[in-house]
């Protein structure tokens, strides 16, 4: 729940660059992601699609991802701590529209704070959307009190300012978005060493990095904030949940039962019917018998309309996949869909493109983070070397997610046959080995490599 923006703006004497539509959208995405959408009630259940979509994209983006800072052991240690939890936080970014990596000095070292989009408020930004001033929120619950820390960053004319404020309020009042009363930072042990104000001269960029989901913001096209990966599918997800609930109702409503007269069963000493143990759900008893005074026994087993209902749900899921940039079959069943080779390829390419765009945005954010880490380390006189991002930082993504490997290998094989590519490069790519190992795998000249170097290879 985002705190009252007006209270924060008044307290810090600033203007928050977020309108009500954007604030409401972020709150909606957060509620959908936590399986608590506003349409949830006794009759409408949720499939958990927002979480599944964010999780799958985060998995595809970060699978087998490796990155390191080669010339700074101290910074790299902190950086690897972030890399180890990057998939989880990429999922949060996908769900909520973005996250902030915010390095800070603590106990003689550089640490990284990760701020999700519902705890982050932009204040000012450049014409290209780079955020230069922002408010970060952190909350702590202590017994019946809620403590909120506001951290304000401003980058202006190569001067950088960081201010910290702390507030407390009673946590027993539901839906209270107020800040409460201002208190000292040492009210919370984790905050007692924080400085109330820091001023840095000759700063080159903000001391935080914003990982923004690379999609157009249809909520507020002027906002620097990113949107959820399922922002274009909120209505479809609602309809899918309703259709899913109809299926659950259909299964429950057509559940096998036996309508019987109470006279079928004997009673215990307290007058309760003695229904066979474990069969209470099967028998539905009624206090009647037919006109001929016979004990009624009527099985209830109506036909189920599951095929039509599931087909309807599947259509919603395919539309959601399209809007979220996922390949068909990620959420939906594809057996009942006749697709041409061109349509299947286009579907996969859509997913590849989505993942690649998010990877690029994440890599750019990590580069900015590393620069900020080095700048803060120098400010606090921590001995670190200058970092050349292109030379000293490596990013290794799993290309098999982005590239159609079979097509790529076939193209390489054709190049080898045409004599414009060395065979060991093809083998290295196909089997994931070095060029030296690939050369050892190849038959010796004069044995089987008489004409085509690929004649002996199995396809």
For the regions a protein language model found, what residue spans apply to each?
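Extended, helix-rich architectural segments
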Residues: 1-132, 139-143, 334, 458-459
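Extended, non-catalytic structural segments that build the interaction scaffolds
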Residues: 23-42, 288-323, 339-362, 392-426
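Short coil/turn segments at secondary-structure boundaries
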Residues: 89, 103-105, 251-260, 330-335, ...
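Extended, regular secondary-structure scaffolds
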Residues: 100-227
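Extended, charged amphipathic alpha-helical segments
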Residues: 189-346, 382
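Active/binding-pocket-proximal capping segment
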Residues: 320, 334-341, 372-376, 382-393, ...
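Long, compositionally biased
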Residues: 351-367, 446-459
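Activation/maturation switch segments at domain boundaries
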Residues: 412-459
